[in-house]
Design a protein with these regions (language model features):
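A short, small-residue-rich loop immediately preceding and capping a beta-strand
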Residues: 626-630
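Conserved divalent-metal-coordinating catalytic cores
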Residues: 12, 23-443, 537-606, 610-625, ...
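Active-site nucleotide/adenylate-binding loops and adjacent lid/helix of ATP-dependent enzymes
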Residues: 1-12
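Short catalytic/ligand-gating loop segments at beta-alpha or beta-beta junctions
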Residues: 15
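Extended, domain-scale alpha-helical bundle/helix-rich regions
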Residues: 360-367, 446-557
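Core catalytic machinery and nucleic-acid-binding channels of phosphodiester-processing enzymes
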Residues: 18-22, 88-89, 519, 523
Length: 680
């Protein structure tokens, strides 16, 4: 110390020696505001391991937790003393975002350091407070009993069905969320389920907009998976049981069809309902699920071809509208109506068929009728969209025309519901620059041996299913391929809607970026108003209002799963393990794709993406090593795509884990052990 003191330039400088805090109860870092957007929340990253450097080291650990606390809440739980200390720092460093390292031992707070990170730009805390009060009222209202539905209450999830967080993002612009609701979650999803034998829950909407974030109403969702012909007593028992299960196990909210509610009859039926029903009630429930499953699988019903016929009609209608002399607003109106009738409706049906196939195969693996390798070989055995992309890119590389590629895939865009995102045709050189193909792109052979075929046929016969093992796998293959095909067709409609919107915006001197703030509802309302000067006034007002509102809503932080209004003010981020695809082990350098930034060379990288819709399929033309997504379930687009390609992936790793990994450089994915290890 004498040596150090002699080296001090200013003799008034002090050396502060801090006592070593050995094995604290908790330790971590607290931010006085969200560093990304200055939103008024305390964000506490901590763990209970007894180590004081685990959080700051950046290493991922299962003991780590993140708590988000709205600044004006009085419910601070065990953190009230810590928050009071931070508030004293905030008085000293006014309007600054602070990063404070701390530990708690024997009920004492120890501050290791406090760093001033940046100045808070805009303070709109009063408006945020008002929005939270209104949101609280909305949630209390929505949780009350619903005469159309069974269930004493409801909860909200951003990933339980139709994956809105994965497809739209956490805070989508008004155009995207309103278009998604109109095309799918207002009524189309419920119509499709009712047509397949499930309970008709209309007029209830599936997706609820909570402070600009898309959430699925879980009571509505669970009711829509009940067979239409089971009695009210069974319905009530089941829905209340499933809701309680989700409340206890929030991490299951993105995999409810696999882990919570049986939506078809498969080999896993018993484990999902446990002792909820009496013997007779269980028999009735099982019987009705078998009827639904059998009707879908039975060749006589020809469900797959019926859905494809609708898609063929849609393609013809799109071409007709392209050639018409209708105004942009008329085209948009007709495209929306056609897409609902012959686009998203058959897509929903084909997605249900593909899910049923996947669920039955997964249940066979769980019952050891098949093994994991059989499942992976099956999904890697047939031609898919990624194969088509790579095949055509190879032709283009050799000097071939891009016409075939653009005709089939040119309309796709990352973030399907964002007009601001450029499609493959507009941005080909960015998405497919330096494309390289994996050396191992050959399709696997799926061979079902005699013993396994007999076991599967025995299961089908025992449960009176009118299908054989061979016919089932043919159905599974066709339904999976047609689901992907149907995405390609109905997203053409979305692309045409955006083309017409851009053209309309150009006439009105409204740019593409601003068009994100026009709602589809306003466009439909304007169908009868063909005067562009009036439309311009209407749109400009909506754009101004929605921009202002979006800036406020963007700062409101909500959890992935909302149990009640208290979660608006104080919530813990759910630690999820993610859905591991394949049983491979890889390690590689991390590259996070952000569309607002230039995309670098992806070759041999482990790619991180927040969203995971079909428009991101371009990444598979770059010989990537692995994939990690923030959002996504076991049956989501990227999960299926990675399974088809045999690509190691972790789908839906959650906000907490994703943020930790995005700050890392090199990692290892062990799909067999279901682990992600940060190396540097």
């Amino acid at each position: 110390l004498k040596f150090i003191s002699k080296k001090l330039i200013n003799q008034k400088d002090k050396i502060i020696i801090q006592e070593l805090i050995f094995k604290p109860k908790i330790s971590g870092v607290i931010f006085s505001s969200d560093i990304n957007n200055d939103s008024p929340y305390y964000i506490i990253n901590f763990d209970r391991s007894g180590k004081t450097n685990l959080i700051t080291s950046g290493k991922k650990n299962s003991s780590m937790q993140t708590i988000v606390i709205y600044k004006e809440t009085k419910n601070l739980g065990i953190f009230h003393k810590l928050i009071n200390v931070i508030k004293k720092f905030e008085i000293i460093f006014k309007d600054k975002v602070l990063d404070v390292e701390f530990a708690v031992k024997n009920n004492k707070i120890y501050i290791f350091q406090c760093r001033n990170l940046k100045k808070i730009k805009i303070n709109n805390n009063d408006t945020i407070k008002e929005n939270l009060i209104n949101l609280k009222k909305k949630i209390i209202k929505l949780k009350k009993k619903n005469p159309y539905l069974c269930g004493e209450t409801t909860y909200f999830s951003n990933m339980s069905d139709w994956n809105p967080a994965e497809i739209l993002g956490n805070k989508p612009k008004p155009l995207g969320i309103s278009l998604y609701k109109e095309l799918i979650t207002n009524s189309v999803w419920a119509q499709q389920r009712a047509e397949y034998g499930y309970k008709d829950v209309r007029p209830n909407h599936l997706l609820i907009n909570l402070a600009g974030s898309p959430y699925i109403d879980l009571r509505t969702d669970l009711n829509s998976f009940l067979p239409a012909n089971i009695n009210q007593t069974i319905q009530r028992k089941l829905i209340n049981f499933f809701l309680k299960n989700l409340k206890r196990n929030k991490s299951l909210h993105d995999k409810i069809e696999f882990e919570v509610i049986p939506t078809i009859f498969d080999a896993d039926f018993e484990k999902k309902i446990k002792n909820t029903l009496s013997i007779n009630e269980k028999i009735e429930y099982k019987k009705q699920l078998k009827i639904i499953t059998n009707n879908i699988l039975d060749k006589k019903n020809d469900i797959l071809n019926k859905e494809v016929n609708k898609l063929n009609k849609l393609e013809k209608k799109i071409l007709q509208l392209k050639k018409s002399n209708l105004s942009e607003i008329q085209n948009i109106y007709f495209l929306i109506e056609e897409c609902k009738k012959n686009g998203t409706l058959p897509f929903a049906g084909l997605a249900r068929c593909a899910f049923i196939s996947n669920s039955i195969i997964k249940s066979f693996v769980n019952k050891n009728i098949l093994d994991e390798k059989d499942k992976l070989n099956f999904y890697e055995s047939f031609f898919n969209i990624s194969n088509f992309i790579n095949k055509n890119l190879l032709k283009i590389k050799k000097g071939g025309s891009k016409k075939i590629f653009f005709n089939k895939l040119g309309h796709l865009r990352p973030l399907t519901y964002s007009i601001e995102s450029k499609n493959y045709q507009e941005n080909f050189s960015t998405y497919f620059k330096d494309f390289k193909f994996s050396k191992n792109k050959g399709r696997k052979k799926f061979i079902l041996n005699n013993k396994k075929e007999i076991a599967i046929n025995k299961f089908f016969k025992k449960n009176s299913f009118k299908i054989s093992a061979k016919s089932f796998f043919a159905f599974a293959k066709k339904s999976t391929q047609l689901r992907e095909y149907s995405k390609l067709i109905f997203t053409k409609c979305i692309n045409e809607i955006f083309i017409n919107l851009c053209s309309l915006g150009k006439e009105m001197n409204i740019n593409r970026k601003d068009m994100e703030f026009v709602t589809i509802n306003k466009l439909i309302e304007s169908y009868s108003n063909l005067n562009n000067s009036k439309l311009k006034k209407i749109f400009n007002k909506e754009i101004t209002d929605n921009k202002k509102n979006h800036k406020i809503l963007y700062k409101i932080k909500l959890p992935d799963f909302i149990e009640n209004h208290k979660d608006l003010y104080f919530h813990k981020l759910i630690n999820v393990n993610g859905n591991f695809i394949t049983n491979k082990k890889i390690h590689g350098k991390i590259y996070e794709i952000k569309l607002e930034k230039k995309i670098a060379n992806l070759n041999n990288k482990v790619v991180l993406i927040e969203n995971a819709d079909p428009g991101y399929d371009f990444i598979f033309s770059h010989n990537i090593k692995g994939l990690i997504t923030k959002y996504g379930g076991p049956n989501s687009h990227m999960a299926i795509r990675c399974m088809e390609l045999g690509l190691p992936a972790v789908i839906g790793i959650g906000e907490n884990n994703y943020n930790s990994l995005s700050n890392s450089t090199f990692l290892e994915i062990d799909c067999d052990l279901k682990k992600v290890n940060v190396i540097t």
